[in-house]
Amino acid sequence: MAKFIVYTTWYHEKGLRPADEMQDGMRKNVKPLSPAEDVFWWKMDDNHHQSITIYSSEDAAKKHRAELEEYRKKSSNEYSIKMVEETMGPVIAQMSKL
């Protein structure tokens, strides 16, 4: 099965937290609970960050979906953030695998 990617954009009402706080949040809240192969967060501007989550398959992403939605709801309230965009789909080419 092909790897599966979930891409999101998030709005931070109070501005982005410092990188070390974002990394700590990922370390404590995302890494232990996520079956994803990898997750990248990056700064878009002072009030937005974007994210790519890489799953081993679409099935793995679907199985994680309910838990992910619950985590998103909690973190949205806790950190005053809102998801403004989400797209997803199967990987069709990966340079490191060529």
Regions found by a protein language model. Give the residues of each.
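Short S/T/G/P-rich N-terminal loop/turn motif that feeds into the first structured element of a domain
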Residues: M1-Q50, I54-E70, N77-L98
